[in-house]
Every structure is written in structure tokens, then in C-alpha cells.
């Protein structure tokens, strides 16, 4: 938009116009045929000695995915060993892996520049998140960090994973009838923790109009694969083999809103971080790990002393169902597990759509990435 559309000046004079970019563009010049200058929304052409027709274009606003890859220029590649914790301080660093054969990028160690400010809670307070990784759909996966980068209560509340631990089905985010994993994979009943998360979502992100920014194709893996009806897939990968994976084998364990990429059982595009994602980020089973998912920007525990739930089943002992989680300050960042009937911290995970644009920031705690407000989310 340009105002006015034309100006008259004397020989060697100057003219100014008020210009504003359309949605999806920012007030920075991409092309500029008259060699003018832009300050804020004022475009100025000096030393005019003849009639001129001027044309300018603005730079497009980058997607968060594009900005993330442009900013994080250190690329160590794929990690080859997950037997030791990774807690090294780092910035501008992205590691690589794959999800469904597609390259994805993730933060590991004590990354200090994976902060995002996105959304508001029901009280109108800004919400802060940590970037976990990119998804195979090009989206950006985030972990909840409350209303401050220095939060020591970065969870939406406490909840049991399920109200009882007395059946193998209770390792499930959703389950069908009881008695077996095959029955559990019918996915007709919400877990206790899913109800907690969904209720928070409707009162906060949905109520404030932020659903349009979130991916419905992102997969949240509640991996219930088991060869012996005792230990589940994540336990074997992370305790026995030390080989985390972003892949989710069984469609019934792929919790999604959209049926094109998973089971389509989610009503809302929100769930939890997985134990495999913690391992990629630098955690190791039953070892302390003061990595980015544990720390706040003041280098303290994001959840104080509170243990918080992950999405990954650990084991069925024959009488108790156990699910993975992360310990608070009494055993810092330790990837552990607990009986599902205990009430522990709930830190939701969401995924921004691949087309979501950033309005600024560099990912640091002082300048977190911010999201451009748009009508469609893109």
C-alpha cells in the first residue's frame, strides 16, 4: 500500500511516501528501482531531477522453519552414540536424524537458543515453549514452558497418566477394552492425562484462537509395541540398545488429528513429548542429564522438584503399568519411569504448521522466536 500515489517536487528535491507491506511481507526492501531509502514505513527519494516512476517490493516474512535453519549454522550431523548424556552448552546448533525417511533437525545438550513465544493462556499471559525438533511434515515441535523463560513450574498442572495401573492397557494415551495391547489399540477411551491436556487446550490455546497455527498431521507416538507383553519398544530402544527413533511403527500408536498420517484419534493437536525425543536431546535412561528440556533460562529446573510425564510406555510388570517421565531437581533431568496412577507434572507438546511465519527473534531467552499473526495461521 502506498500513500500518496504520486508527488511533485522542485529540481533536485525530495519526496516521501507512506508504504506498508501486505500480510506475509515485512518492511524491508527487496527491490528498489529509484534508489530510495526506507525508514519504518516512510519511503524517501532524494535528488529528484526528472520525472520518475518508482517500484519497490518488500521481503517476504520467513517461515519459522526457514528462519530456524538459517540461524542455526552449526550442523554436527547425526549423533552416533546415545550411551552417554549430552549436556554441553551450545547455540546455533542443530543435529540431524530422520522421521519416515525424511531429514529432521533437533536440539541437544544444553541448547540455549530454542525458545519460542507463542499463544496466551486463559488469563492473557504469554506462553513460552522450547523447540524439540522439526517434524517430517516440516512443522516445528514445541515443549511447554509456562509463562516465563525462568519458570520453575513449567507444567499445566499435575495428573495421573491413568487412574489405575492394574492393567496393561493403562500405558495407553487412549485405550479400548482391557486385557491386551491389541484391545488397548482400539483407542476408544481417553486416558486421564489426555483429558487433562485436552481440557487445558480448550480453555487456553483454542479459546484464544491459536488452533489455526497448529499441525494436524504431526504424529505423537504412544509406542505400545512389545514382544513379550512386559517391556515396550521405547524401553528396548533406550535402555537395552541405546538407539532412539522418531519413527512410530503401528498406525494405532500414531496419535494424530488427520487420518492421512496416523490414527486420527486426537480431537485437538496436542499431546506429550516422547522418551525417544528426550534421548535425542541428550538424556539417558536413569542417568542425570541437565539438558535444555530440564533447565530454564536461569539454569535451574524448569519444573522444580516435580517429575513430569512422557508419552512412551515403559513396561507392564504383571500387576503395574509404568510410563516414562523426567525427574525434577532431586535427580536432575533423569529419564525414568513411574506407575501410571501417580499424579505428576504435565508438559504438553504441540507442533506449529510448516507454513507458520516468524515475526522476529533469534531463539534466545531474551529474544525468543515470535509468530506472525495471520488470518489463516500461514
Predicted regions and their residues:
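Surface-exposed coil/turn segments at beta-strand junctions on protein surfaces, enriched
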Residues: 8-12, 38, 47-49, 341
Amino acid at each position: 500500500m502506498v500513500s500518496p500515489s504520486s508527488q511533485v517536487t522542485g529540481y533536485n528535491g525530495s519526496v516521501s511516501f507512506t508504504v506498508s507491506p501486505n500480510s506475509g511481507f515485512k518492511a524491508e526492501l527487496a527491490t528498489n528501482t529509484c534508489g530510495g531509502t526506507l525508514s519504518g514505513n516512510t519511503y524517501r527519494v532524494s535528488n529528484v531531477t526528472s520525472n520518475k516512476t518508482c517500484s519497490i517490493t518488500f521481503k517476504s516474512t520467513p517461515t519459522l522453519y526457514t528462519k530456524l535453519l538459517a540461524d542455526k549454522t552449526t550442523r554436527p550431523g547425526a549423533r552416533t552414540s546415545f550411551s552417554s548424556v549430552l549436556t554441553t552448552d551450545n547455540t546455533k546448533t542443530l543435529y540431524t536424524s530422520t522421521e519416515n525417511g525424511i531429514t529432521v533437525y533437533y536440539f541437544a545438550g544444553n541448547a540455549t537458543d530454542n525458545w519460542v513465544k507463542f499463544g496466551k493462556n486463559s488469563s492473557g499471559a504469554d506462553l513460552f515453549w522450547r523447540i524439540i525438533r522439526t517434524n517430517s511434515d516440516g512443522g516445528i515441535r514445541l515443549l511447554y514452558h509456562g509463562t516465563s523463560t525462568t519458570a520453575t513450574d513449567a507444567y499445566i498442572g499435575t495428573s495421573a497418566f491413568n487412574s489405575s495401573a492394574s492393567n496393561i492397557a493403562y500405558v495407553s494415551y487412549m485405550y479400548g477394552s482391557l486385557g491386551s495391547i491389541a484391545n488397548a489399540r482400539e483407542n476408544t477411551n481417553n486416558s486421564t492425562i489426555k483429558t487433562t491436556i485436552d481440557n487445558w487446550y480448550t480453555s487456553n490455546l483454542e479459546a484464544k484462537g491459536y488452533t489455526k497455527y497448529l499441525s494436524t498431521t504431526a504424529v505423537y507416538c504412544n509406542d505400545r509395541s512389545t514382544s513379550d507383553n512386559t517391556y515396550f519398544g521405547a524401553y528396548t530402544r533406550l535402555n537395552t540398545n541405546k538407539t532412539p527413533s522418531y519413527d512410530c511403527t503401528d498406525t494405532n500408536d500414531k496419535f494424530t488429528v488427520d487420518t492421512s498420517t496416523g490414527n486420527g484419534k486426537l480431537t485437538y493437536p496436542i499431546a506429550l513429548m516422547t522418551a525417544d525425543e528426550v534421548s535425542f536431546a541428550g538424556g539417558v535412561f536413569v542417568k542425570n542429564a541437565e539438558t535444555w528440556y530440564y533447565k530454564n533460562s536461569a539454569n535451574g529446573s524448569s519444573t522444580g522438584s516435580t517429575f513430569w510425564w512422557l508419552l512412551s510406555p515403559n513396561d507392564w510388570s504383571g500387576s503395574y503399568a509404568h510410563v516414562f517421565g523426567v525427574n525434577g531437581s532431586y535427580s536432575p533431568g533423569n529419564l525414568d519411569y513411574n506407575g501410571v496412577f501417580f499424579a505428576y507434572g504435565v508438559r504438553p507438546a504441540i507442533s506449529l504448521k510448516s507454513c507458520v511465519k516468524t515475526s522476529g527473534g533469534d531463539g534466545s531467552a531474551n529474544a525468543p522466536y515470535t509468530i506472525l499473526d495471520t488470518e489463516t495461521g500461514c
